[in-house]
Amino acid sequence: TEKFNGGYESWDSNRDKWCRSRNTFCKKYPRSQYNAAIHNIESIACYDYKAKIDSNVHRLHSVITNIQKDYRHFLLYDEQPLVGIDIANSQPYLLCLLFNPIFWEKDSNTTLNIGTLPTNIQSLFSQEHFVEIRDYVSSLTAEALQEYKQIASEGRVYDHIMSLINSRRNTTLDKKNVKTMMLIVFFSKNRYYHQQGATLKRLFDNTYPEIYSLIALAKRDNHAALACLLQSIESEIILHRCCKRIWKESNHQVPVFTIHDSIATTTEHVEWVKGIMQEELTNAIGIPPTLKEEQWNLSQVGHPQYLY
């Protein structure tokens, strides 16, 4: 591809990355990126997939999750192309589970509640905090949540909020701006609110005040708690429900590869895998998701003129 043909210097196109520990943008080093790409490609060639579930949010990491997106289009399974099945607007969609008061009760009889998640995730919240969140959610009306749940189910959260804010505020936000806004809303500290950079966070609060209040309440004692909770919910559903069921019902014959909120499989199995994902996500979250397919093949590669 263009980056490999151009050597180290061509890798500087992805030069800036947000560094949480330094609270600023840091340079990405082309040499490190180049070496990482080569390392991942060689690992796949050697069948060393480096699969490991982390002990923090219990996501599965592998050479496939680590490799840059463009290079996934070169991957085949048994000479067959792969298709990724993604949850549209996954984090905003998974948030809908937290609107259910019963989720916050460890001993409830729901298929997925805080008590079914790993103990380190449960320990992010005190029992008093569980009760406080549950009581707050119980106080919300169905009308306050209805619109958000509808657009989350349809995978239109970013588009809807972009349109809503632009019409109300006479602004020109694009989808990238809105995705940034959602990252800030979900993962930044609550005290980061009145600063100039938190404008989009305030816009979300003004648009969905009840939902913003729930997010802020969940992050009150630990701003990382919500991110860890949502990613753990994602892992529970994708790995331990969808993939486990696929593996069992197919008698170990259907290949699956996960990239956090996405499952990839071969073309012939896409519809069947999508059906299982649809059922498991709907059962767990309470509303159906929108699933999108991404073809992994050379026609999707950036700068295809460098392939041959």
Where are these regions (language model features)?
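Surface-exposed, low-hydrophobicity interaction/linker segments
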Residues: 35-36, 43, 52, 199-244
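Helical catalytic core of nucleic-acid polymerases
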Residues: 64-223
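A short acidic (Asp/Glu
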Residues: 91-98, 267-276
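Catalytic palm active-site di-aspartate
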Residues: 86-87, 182, 255-266
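Non-catalytic nucleic-acid-binding interfaces of large nucleic-acid enzymes and RNP effectors
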Residues: 1-73, 78-80, 88, 287-308
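Active-site palm subdomain of RNA-directed nucleic acid polymerases
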Residues: 236-259
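Feature representing long, continuous alpha-helical segments
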Residues: 176, 180, 184, 236-240, ...
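C-terminal polymerase-core module
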Residues: 189-200, 270-308
